[in-house]
Amino acid sequence: MRKIIMLLLVSLSIVSCNKAKSPKTEVSIVGDEFYINGKPTFEGKTWRGMKIQGLLPNARLVNGIFDDKTDSTRYKWVYPDTKVWDANRNTKEFVENMPKWQEKGLLAFTINLQGGSPEGYSKKQAWHNSAIMPDGSLDMEYMNRLKLILDKADELQMVVILGLYYFGQEKYMNDSVSVKNGIKNAVEWILKHDYRNVLLEINNECDFYKLDGLNPETVHKSIEYAKTITHNGRRLLVSTSYAGKKVPSDKVIAVSDFILLHGNSIRNPEDITVQVDSVRKSTAYTTKPIVYNEDDHFKFDEEVNNFVKATDAYASWGYFDFRKKDEPFEQGFQCIPADWGINSERKKGFFNILTEWKNAQ
């Protein structure tokens, strides 16, 4: 009897351990298609007569681990109900809403170790928000919040486009050596935690940086460097982004695993086609996915908009929505404090299209 009881306890222990292990979500690229766990996204599906297999619709949710290390600006981000800023609450509410986004059809989102402007667009950025310290080491309070998000994304089979640097925070980095250290430390952290659902964006809109390794003349070297960092024979898929309407340099197109574009400033949807075609016509381009991960144009109720034209050009599209002046708390996914729920008409318009994709044949 004792042996039977012991065997049962061992069996229960094994089952318990197996349940504790999170299923790994792995993103990969085959040609110009994204695969999740060995299968193309939206396998075999079309939408309005357009191929969507292999595309990666996404949203810019860069401030999921936001905090402000500057006492003089922290007051700007207080919640309307508590009148206090709370970085842990921000991440907690982000994670709580992730299943709702996934259920509506969102496959991926961009988050950044230095966030993005908590005001949407800003002329001056006095706040200090960075998971990367001035010397390139990592701030573990930020990384612990990031882990909550990456773990949940892994569970939900969602892909994370992880940005490292944001131009508003470049001034807090010591020098180009610290930038390189930051790349090394962040990539090694991702690999050693065995996250396989992460795509890497070196920096958001490289046009605006001055430091070597981040500026448009040298960022291709950082892409190449990040690709050399491995753990157990595995590396991350790497790219970077430029400002709205810009086409990446031939050097960046050549070394990137996928191409990132921004649609800000593109008011005529036909210009989306021009931008995508310009990438494919580059002599440096080889077959690889093209992804918008920032576009602040909507009009989702109209037959033609930037989302539709990107899809028609076979490029994944990314939704960027921030709360405009005098808009209520529910608006936008970037301004802090953020309402991470789908509680505005703009958000509902975007997610309604994703639901159409999810249910497409």
Sequence positions of predicted segments:
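Basic side chains
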Residues: 2-3, 60, 110, 288
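Generic N-terminal initiation segments characterized by hydrophobic and/or small/turn-forming residues
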Residues: 4-9, 53, 153, 258, ...
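Bacterial Sec-dependent N-terminal signal peptides
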Residues: 1-23
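Extracellular glycoside hydrolase catalytic/binding regions
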Residues: 182-184, 197-199, 203-351
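Generic hydrophobic-segment detector
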Residues: 3-6, 28-29, 143
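Active-site mouth of glycoside hydrolases
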Residues: 30, 35, 40-41, 46-256, ...
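Extended substrate-binding grooves/exosites of carbohydrate-active enzymes
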Residues: 25, 32-33, 40-88, 287-292, ...
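Generic structural signal for short, solvent-exposed loop/turn connectors between secondary structure elements
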Residues: 1-3, 21, 167-181, 245, ...
